[in-house]
Amino acid sequence: MPATNINIGEPWMWAAFIVFVLAMLALDLFVFGGRKAHRVSVREALSWVIAWCLLALSFAALLWWYLHGAFGADIARQKTLEFLTGYLIEQSLSIDNMFVFVMIFSYFAVPPELQRRVLLYGVLGAIVMRAVMIFAGVWLVSQFEWLLYAFGVFLIITGIKMLVFAEHQPDLDKNPLLRWVRGHMRITSSFHGERFFVLQNGVRWATPMFLVLVLIEASDLMFAVDSIPAIFAVTTDPFIVFTSNIFAIMGLRALYFLLADMADRFHLLKYGLAIVLVFIGGKMVLMPWLHMPVEWSLAVVGGVILSSVLLSLVMTKDAERRTE
């Protein structure tokens, strides 16, 4: 049986990974300052970004070691590459989500020391939503294989739209979800620390922090609609899809605090992400006629993202020199 058709997730592997995720969230919440409102420094954010990257690479190494002994070298190599490619795709596409976080926090003028907690709850919600979407997607693809081609067309269209509207900034005042919540709930005019709800004269009011949480969860749902089909171009193994997604999500919060103040320096990244979506969508549509090894997908995605980041930095530096 080809390695790509084997689902490797055994019950103990699922249980161990879920315990690991819950343990890391508990450490973040109760040990490493998650309970205390504070402004996340660049040093702290960088430490967490490095930690999550090392954890993802360590997981890949453990996965290869276990599969090499249980299934052989070919399957170990294939599944490890699938995980790394999926992780890179999810991490890259999640950066676009980070830009939306910047816009939401700026719109509501959320103090930096309050952003950590709302992003933690955002991560928790994202894990649940993505788990549901991943298992639903894997089941649908297993029942209706033609959906892979539909996903491919969808990603191509999404990538083209991203190219065309890369410079477009959505107007949150016109956001239908935000308008609906404001029209159906009592919202306080100011923040009350990290609280989402407060009692005023015996009446429960939502705070602006609740609106921020709603928009962050909604934005992750929208980005998951793009990113989850994208990884199906690499693998439909639910364990690989789930673990690569979760590692990317867990690292996103630290990445936000590291890069939020420099978001304008990566102005070409959206174009790179759009090219990645078109490439992945094309790969899915052409699967019956063109087989691309997972190593090539990893190289293309990594090359496009790295090139767009480096070119953004070069152009930004040149622009700064001209204005001096």
Describe the function of each predicted region.
Residues 1-324:
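Multi-pass alpha-helical transmembrane bundle typical of ion/small-solute transporters
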